[in-house]
UniProtKB/Swiss-Prot annotation:
This is Uridylate kinase. GO terms for cellular component: cytosol. It comes from the Bacteria. The gene is pyrH. Inhibited by UTP. It comes from Azoarcus sp. (strain BH72). Homohexamer. Its EC number is 2.7.4.22. Catalyzes the reversible phosphorylation of UMP to UDP. Keywords: ATP-binding, Cytoplasm, Kinase, Nucleotide-binding, Pyrimidine biosynthesis, Transferase.
Length: 238
């Protein structure tokens, strides 16, 4: 069997990815399919960390826009990510994948606190670690949490799972002539003003020379193809 291109990855999942076609919440069929994709990768011997968003339940920026205190709204968004992480971990266990949730906000009766050394040990022992509650601080996105946790656990790449199959020259929904980048450097992405991750997360990945692959979580087998080093999505590199 061909070896995977990466030994340890950080997968960034948006909360919206868990909704499927629903307007709100967690779609069990979608979660089951995502779990099966992750399970397939773990069977290759790849160590998987996951950062998950909470936008399917509550989005801090939206709460702040409606007049809520921004920090309060962000903390509510962090709690939403804990709910998503617990649902994902439960689905993994039901599918034979060992998983642990570590939260940047302490909720010790429910999930483990985030402890870097413990997270790395879980990964080394073949468990999927789902990092919840973002960075634990308001004003930082879960994209930034993905860049931070990816750097902390010495992941070899951040995989951003989205609804589109990569980074394009323009919005492919609006411009039928838009073309997908197969590979692009951090500097070129900045020069073209491409929104790969939010600015803080992008800068951290660039400074740490941590590559990013943007791909569609809705394409069957895409996660495995990325991990195997195939031409899937868009690779952003130093």
């Amino acid at each position: 069997m061909t070896a995977a291109a990466y030994k340890r990855i950080l997968l960034k999942l948006s909360g919206e990815a868990l909704m499927g076609d629903d307007a709100y919440g967690i779609n069990e069929d979608v979660v089951s399919r995502i779990v099966s994709e992750i399970a397939e990768v773990t069977r290759l011997g790849v160590e998987v960390g996951v950062v998950i968003g909470g936008g399917n339940i509550f989005r801090g920026m939206k709460g702040a826009a409606s007049g809520m205190d921004r920090a309060t709204a962000d903390y509510m968004g962090m709690l939403a990510t804990v709910m998503n992480a617990m649902a994902l971990a439960d689905a993994m266990r039901r599918n034979g994948v060992e998983a642990r949730v570590q939260s940047a906000l302490r909720i010790d009766q429910v999930v483990e606190p985030y402890i870097r050394g413990r997270a790395i040990r879980h990964l080394e022992e073949g468990r999927v670690v789902i990092f919840a509650a973002g960075t634990g601080n308001p004003f930082f996105t879960t994209d930034t949490a993905a860049a931070l946790r990816g750097s902390e656990i010495a992941a070899q790449i951040v995989l951003k799972a989205t609804k589109v199959d990569g980074v394009y020259t323009a919005d492919p929904k609006k411009d039928p002539a838009a073309q997908r980048f197969h590979r692009i450097s951090f500097d070129e992405a900045i020069g073209r003003n491409l929104a790969v991750l939010d600015a803080t997360a992008f800068a951290l990945c660039r400074d740490q020379k941590l590559p990013i692959n943007v791909f569609s979580i809705f394409k069957p087998g895409a996660l495995k193809r990325v991990v195997m080093g195939e031409d899937e999505g868009t690779l952003v590199h130093s």
